């Protein structure tokens, strides 16, 4: 990854914006800062105002691990597209995913609720996925051991994957964020995309991005990330949006 805010990065951003791209963003850790309690997450006012202005110039998408219903009220603006549950929940898709294969895991969670609570593991059921949060656990080793035990012998129809202090579980055949962004590019009638994300599930976009896309990771802490560029931290997201506005107003 290379820093976005240098000469090469700014040149790449200018080129892709002049190609009239889809602008796609993750939510937690990207548009909204990471917080201890997931329910407290909101897009800062300065960021939401910039996004609202961008949405009048280009199609904007939010592609998040949260459910569509959950994230919609946290944005402060109306994007053209919202895709939730790591790509599995797309209201614009003609056929919705059958997530009934999660029911067995739901029953397993209910049976072990006391053990999970004692270990500091919070379970979030988002319909198309389950998320096991362990950010607030006092003993991280104990929390992770509890999660591993819960998922031992997991139904092969399910797929677990990690994130920042979370383990997510979706249907094995569920679309991921890479599938979602590729679909949105086509539906928006765009030839290119800008995608900004910060977590493990955003790598699905970074890995499969076409050469003319611009991919940006928030944070440079993962040397193996396949993003093309990086921002130092969440505080630089607002600056990026302002640069985008400046360029798009001249196109």
Regions found by a protein language model. Give the residues of each.
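Charged, glycine-interspersed solvent-exposed loop segments at helix/strand-loop junctions
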Residues: 120-138, 158-171
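Residue-level signal for inorganic ion chemistry
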Residues: 29, 82, 132, 181, ...
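Substrate-recognition/cap helix-loop segment adjacent to the acidic, metal-dependent catalytic center
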Residues: 67-83, 138, 142-159
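Mg2+-dependent phosphoryl-transfer enzymes with acidic/Ser/Thr/Gly-rich catalytic loops
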Residues: 2-6, 18, 176-251
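Non-catalytic pre-domain segments flanking phosphatase-related domains
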Residues: 1-27, 32-38, 46, 53, ...
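Substrate-recognition "cap/lid" segment bordering the active-site pocket of phosphatases
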Residues: 83-107, 161-190
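Active-site phosphate-binding/coordination module
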Residues: 34-36, 42-126
């Amino acid at each position: 990854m290379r820093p976005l805010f240098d000469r090469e990065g700014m040149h790449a951003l200018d080129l892709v914006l002049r190609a009239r791209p889809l602008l796609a963003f993750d939510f937690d850790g990207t548009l909204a800062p990471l917080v201890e309690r997931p329910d407290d997450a909101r897009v800062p006012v300065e960021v939401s105002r910039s996004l609202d202005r961008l949405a009048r110039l280009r199609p904007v998408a939010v592609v998040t691990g949260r459910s569509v219903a959950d994230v919609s009220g946290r944005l402060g603006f109306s994007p053209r597209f919202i895709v939730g549950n790591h790509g599995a929940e797309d209201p614009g898709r003609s056929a919705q995913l059958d997530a009934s294969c999660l029911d067995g895991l739901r029953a397993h969670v209910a049976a072990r609720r006391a053990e999970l609570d004692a270990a500091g593991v919070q379970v979030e059921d988002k319909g198309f996925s389950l998320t096991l949060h362990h950010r607030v656990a006092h003993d991280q080793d104990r929390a992770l051991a509890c999660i591993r035990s819960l998922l031992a012998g997991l139904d092969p129809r399910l797929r677990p994957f990690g994130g920042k202090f979370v383990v997510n579980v979706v249907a094995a055949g569920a679309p991921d964020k890479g599938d979602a962004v590729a679909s949105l590019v086509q539906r928006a009638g765009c030839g290119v995309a800008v995608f900004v994300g910060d977590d493990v599930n955003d790598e699905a976009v970074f890995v499969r991005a076409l050469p003319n896309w611009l991919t940006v990771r928030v944070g440079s802490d993962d040397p193996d990330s396949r993003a093309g560029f990086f921002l130092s931290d969440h505080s630089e997201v607002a600056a990026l949006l302002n640069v985008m506005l400046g360029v798009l107003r001249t196109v």
